């Protein structure tokens, strides 16, 4: 099941981004200095007690020079469209404003659960002023302070009470779930239809015509699949035309439910910045990844074109160096038959478990080939390694000092593991841990 989504909505200057940052904390910080991985502050993962969720800050939408109330309306529409629960943010210092009432009218019609938050209640003396907010029609207002972090626990408790009940998906463990993600009109739905051999998903040359994520069970050569097709961005309202940020929302929710993620590119148009952003989310998820170049039939080419395009992909997506690249045409169905075997291969790699003795032989051979680094006269010592997880393969390496594990040496060890065990299409995680 995808994680529930909370949207924070409200007029400007009520502190939406401050509350967003308070809730997500360090989870939005960039931990890898790799080109192409952009953590978008408008959307992030959050956690409260035993609840995991995704959260949207609608204040991050760049509307441009639109009139004030139009901006508010567009932000509210995004929240209504995407969220399971909406936190309606107001400002306790200003009281109820006409703009708050405008937001309330829109949200009241949404029939989504609304939790009313009154921000900037920074001291107990201000609590008596929040009762005016009952007039907005959303029940008890929750006083909070983004500056001091006060009241967020009660607010999140109330939001979590409205999360959809989690239901187990009716697919067995042998079923491979894969999603197709990419910007609008790269041919995701056409590719689904090419695989299925039928017009199962509505397809149009208008970008964003797939209405939502669609699950399609599918079997081929005794292997069961579930295809999760996502719209890149719905054609609904000017807000979707004016920002690309929300194109990742459905992709992210589909990624959470996938074993394998297909990042679909438009071979005719080439690579743009939004492709890199979406691919970065695929990498960050830890899922197996395949890069699919669609519309290859429309590309003027010679014997060098494919190699040049592949080199361009590798240059732009350095963080996906492990992902195989498949060139095809959903329209003509050329090379589409090559896709499922690659999906099977990367899914298998994603689940590889290596015996501890074999793993340690490979690690020690790597150390003999390329001695561990030193820093300030101290040398990194590797004692032993063990695999602690699959999907993705995750290894703990016990060392004398974790600070001595330089990222370049970690990358060297990852490359040696790939050479030894394959790991096609899957990221590898290495955790350095000091031995007690």
Curated annotation (Swiss-Prot):
Sequence positions that bind GTP 1: 10-17, 57-61, 119-122
Binding site for GTP 2: 182-189, 229-233, 294-297
Domain EngA-type G: 4-167, 176-351
Family affiliation: Belongs to the TRAFAC class TrmE-Era-EngA-EngB-Septin-like GTPase superfamily. EngA (Der) GTPase family.
NCBIfam families noted in UniProt: GTPase_EngA, small_GTP
Quaternary context: Associates with the 50S ribosomal subunit.
Protein name: GTPase Der
Origin species: Bacillus mycoides (strain KBAB4)
Originating gene: der
